[in-house]
Amino acid sequence: MNTGESLSLTVTRTIRADAARLFQAWTDPAQLVAWWGPRPVTCTEAQVDLRVGGRYRTGNRLPDGNILYISGVFEAIEAPRLLIYTWQVEPAVGRPERVTVRFDERDGQTEVSITHERIGDAALRDRHQAGWQGCFDSLAAYLEG
């Protein structure tokens, strides 16, 4: 039962790439299409207006062939260390969720930490948790080859 309180999650992964390369992979539409999504989900399109107040949108092909669109607005950008943006599945209903992505480079590799907040219920939180882990797998495969 949802008592009106929102849930959050944090997932972290160290990837063998510098922070600038990771930030670019996360914000360049051509690169997003190449890696975004937990397999077998694939990204069919990506639009990114990388500025505070700018919008992003991804089209995500699900295993059943349907396209799920996720969009939001950038709230903070500190290249190549931080992105904060809202997150809503279209059509957008209710208060958007919020995603914070931190890139902490050390010794030629980068710890990427995602905090996903304002999640409506535990089942959705668990799906997001699995989705972000899958996105990390796809991102690591894309960058580490």
Q: Where are the model-predicted features located?
A:
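Hydrophobic ligand-binding cavity/cleft-lining segments
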Residues: M1-T42
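Short, hydrophobic/aromatic-enriched beta-strand segments in well-ordered soluble domains
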Residues: R13, I114-H116
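Tryptophan-centric aromatic hotspots in well-structured domains and transmembrane helices
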Residues: F23-W26, W87, Q129-W132, F136
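Hydrophobic-ligand binding "helix-grip"
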Residues: V33, A46-V52, R57-D107, E117
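Generic alpha-helical structural signal
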Residues: R16, S71, Q133-D137
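A conserved amphipathic terminal alpha-helix motif
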Residues: E117-G145
